[in-house]
Structure formats: C-alpha cells, structure tokens
C-alpha cells in the first residue's frame, strides 16, 4: 500500500499545537484602513479549528 501523502496546501495553513490545530485568521491581509485597532488586534489572536471541521483537517494532514 502506498504512503499517505499530506495535502501540502493544508500543511502550509494549519499547525499542530498540543491537542488543537491552529489556523490563521481571515480579513487581515488588505483593506485594513477602515478596521479599528481593536478589531485588527483581535485578528492577531490565535484561532483554532472547531470540532465540526477537525476530522476533515486531520485527514488532510494525515493525522487520522
């Protein structure tokens, strides 16, 4: 049986942190002038994959 291959796009977007999968935050790459400093600071906080998507992300990362 061939080796499982990690989805390379997913590998670049998600990082494994202890028992959680860390992900990036959307809406922080451009059009930042209309967003308040408080809102932009909130976008820098770490985000984690929710339980509904956890199994599918684990399959992409060959962790299942």
Swiss-Prot record:
The protein's GO terms of the molecular function aspect are:
structural constituent of ribosome
The membrane-spanning stretches of this chain are none
The Gene Ontology biological process terms listed for this entry are: translation
Q: Mind telling me which Gene3D superfamilies this protein's record contains?
A: 4.10.410.60
Q: Does the keyword Iron apply?
A: no
Q: Name one Pfam family in it.
A: Ribosomal_L35p
Report the InterPro entries cross-referenced here. Ribosomal_bL35 (IPR001706), Ribosomal_bL35-like (IPR021137), Ribosomal_bL35_CS (IPR018265), Ribosomal_bL35_sf (IPR037229)
Q: Which first-to-last residue range defines the signal peptide?
A: none
Gene Ontology cellular-component annotations: cytosolic large ribosomal subunit
> Is Electron transport included in the keywords of this UniProt record?
no
| Keywords carried by this UniProt record | Ribonucleoprotein, Ribosomal protein
Which HAMAP family does this UniProt record tie to the protein? Ribosomal_bL35
Q: Give the similarity note.
A: Belongs to the bacterial ribosomal protein bL35 family.
The name this protein carries in UniProt is Large ribosomal subunit protein bL35
Report which gene this protein is encoded by.
Answer: rpmI
């Amino acid at each position: 049986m061939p080796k499982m291959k990690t989805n390379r796009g997913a590998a670049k977007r998600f990082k494994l942190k202890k028992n959680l999968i860390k992900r990036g935050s959307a809406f922080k790459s451009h059009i930042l002038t209309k967003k308040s400093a408080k809102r932009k600071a909130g976008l820098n906080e770490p985000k984690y994959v929710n339980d509904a998507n956890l199994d599918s992300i684990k399959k992409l990362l060959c962790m299942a």
